[in-house]
From Swiss-Prot:
Name by which UniProt lists this protein: Polyamine aminopropyltransferase
TM annotation in the entry: none
Sites where the protein binds S-methyl-5'-thioadenosine: Q32, E107, D138, G139, P163
Record domain PABS: where: 3-236
Source organism (scientific name): Moorella thermoacetica (strain ATCC 39073 / JCM 9320)
Oligomer and partners: Homodimer or homotetramer.
Binding, spermidine: H63, D87, D156, S157, T158, D159
Length: 283
């Protein structure tokens, strides 16, 4: 294999490797190691602590599915909070919705936003929308201090290691419930159903104790571990399987459609199996 290759060790026994054209930027921020690289296969790629966060080639699978599912589940979302997501991809999708009046992006690391703006403009372009407020602070604390504030809350976090662990806790989900308005909707990325089944099962059980409606849905993300990714949704009122598509806005997407929205909640048997398994059982 000629050239320089980057490998992300996704599990102790699995790595994904891509050939690099060049490293565009590298630094150690106050919070993490950050790099932007240009690759043969996926174009420009954002790495945090040597973990692939997003790529120009496949980012739309993830960003469209984490954003449009909750935004179309809620019939009239006006205020949205994004925790994490400093690359701007989720915000870009949110501001496509005409009902949105304000988006608050809470990102702890200002350098992520700065580098996304410079090196990933096609992903970060929504950050300059007049409806967007960017706050560089801790998302856990931000949610803890809010009550009855947001129609939609989206958690676009890194993996559950280090400071991000708190974003996967039952205490955080209870605070999210309080921060949502009476008919609010919440979605978080919740890792790989292939490699993180116990985590997903625990999160689903936590959400079912907190929200009247709790569901899991899936999408493909080629550069993420296993290529299949899970999102956990909690809703105070609206069921994502009962969207009135006649009223939903028509927004430009590359992956998400009403049919894919519905199909994403149709879980394969292996996922149903681990969701229903006793807590002590491993997969």
């Amino acid at each position: 294999m000629r050239g320089i290759w980057f490998s992300e060790l996704q599990t102790p026994d699995l790595a994904i490797s891509v050939r690099l054209n060049q490293t565009l930027h590298h630094e150690k921020t106050p919070y993490q190691e950050l790099a932007v690289v240009d690759t043969e296969a996926y174009g420009r790629m954002l790495l945090l602590d040597n973990i692939i966060q997003t790529t120009v080639k496949d980012e739309f699978f993830y960003h469209e599915m984490i954003a449009h599912v909750p935004l179309n589940t809620h019939p009239n979302p006006r205020t949205a909070l994004v925790i994490g997501g400093g690359d701007g991809g989720v915000v870009r999708e949110i501001v496509k919705h005409p009902s949105i009046e304000k988006v608050t992006l809470v990102e702890i690391d200002a350098r992520v936003v700065a580098n996304a703006r410079e090196y990933l403009p096609e992903i970060a372009c929504g950050l300059d929308d007049a409806r967007v407020e960017i706050r560089f602070e801790d998302g856990i604390e931000h949610v803890r201090q809010r009550e009855n504030t947001y129609d939609v809350i989206i958690v676009d976090s890194t993996d559950p290691i280090g400071p991000a662990v708190g974003l996967f806790s039952a205490e955080f989900y209870r605070n999210v419930y309080r921060a949502l308005k009476a008919d609010g909707v919440f979605v978080a990325q919740t890792e790989s159903p292939i490699f993180n089944s116990r985590l997903i099962r625990r999160i689903q059980r936590d959400l079912k104790e907190i929200f009247p409606i709790a569901r899991l849905y899936l999408t493909t993300v080629p550069t993420y571990p296993g290529g299949l990714w899970a999102f956990s949704l909690g809703s105070k009122k609206y069921d994502p399987l009962e969207v009135d598509w006649r009223q939903a806005p028509k927004v430009a997407t590359r992956y998400y459609t009403p049919a894919i929205h519905q199909a994403a909640f149709s879980l394969p048997p292996f996922v149903q199996e681990f969701l229903e398994a006793p807590e002590e059982e491993e997969f």
